[in-house]
Amino acid sequence: RGPCQRVPAIATMQNEPAHSDATGIFKDFKLSEEDRYELYVASWMHDCGKVVTPEYVVDKSTKLETITDRIHEVRVRFEVLKRDAEIDCLKAIIAGGDAAALQAALTARLAEIDADYYFIADTNVGGEFLDDDAKARVKTIAEQTWMRTLNNRVGISIEERKRFERTPAPELPVVEPLLMDREDHLIPYEVQPFSADPDNPYGFKVDVPEYKFNKGEVYNLSISRGTLTNEERFIINDHIVQTAVMLENLPLPKALRRVPEIACGHHEKIDGTGYPRKLTGDQMSVQARVMAIADVFEALTAADRPYKDRKTLSQSLRIMSFMAKDNHMDRDLYHLFLDSGVYRDYADKFLLEDQIDEVDIEEYRVA
């Protein structure tokens, strides 16, 4: 069962406690059967815009990954450094140098190269927050050099050749940094996203990066959290823009007139810093705020994402508590989510056994 099936399940489960809240904050929130169906349709359609999102961006699981993971290319450069070190050592021995001292220096240098590579490889995974010291080490490693003797502008696509032509070709052989942010790594937009227009008819308020993609190696490896660059995150976030355009141009019947608003609110935040319209909680319907909680919980607990490990119930609720505290999701609906036991009902139906751990909901309440 994929997210398109799981999100409707959570949203439907979460909606009922709000409907049944006779004396609390949601006592005036009542649902007809048409309302329930409207939410159901909206939850099925909430990510329909992803049909135009490149799959390799959605599934990007390492920092250097594009269509393939460029860590393999980077690893070969480290191998070249090791071969060069061995060749330099042998040349020095042949020239009459102290063999024992040179061999000891070689052993130390090879160990240093190995350590640098494994640091870069670990950084590529993006599992931990990358602090300033780690970013500085990436740059230091990148400044090491290797010699390229072959022309890198042959055997490539027309588009890539055009990007290379922005800069003069160096004379070969050329000494280059081990890791680079090159001009040809910057890929411009063919057409500027219409959502960037402040006068767009949909009310989108988005910040558009200067480039469509930035494939710089140091730039990507220096991502602070996760594996996505700002450019890639914009492309992924654009799915909700496309969802809104699709749904708002459908001739929906009156009973489904709020489907676009409900479906397209799951990336908005209560404090108005969300996407794509920067709506505040007061500007969102209860159903749209329910969708936001459903989408977050499904994403955190999903076991079928290639770019992240699945989280347990307790891990997921802890993250959601931080989001509620920061006014990124509706605090009252989040508490209702806990008190009603929706999280547990969903877990029993959809989560793997090793994800369902003991949960004390009092630990995850937000004052």
Q: Residues of each region from the PLM?
A:
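Histidine- and acidic-residue-rich, metal-dependent catalytic cores
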Residues: R1-A367
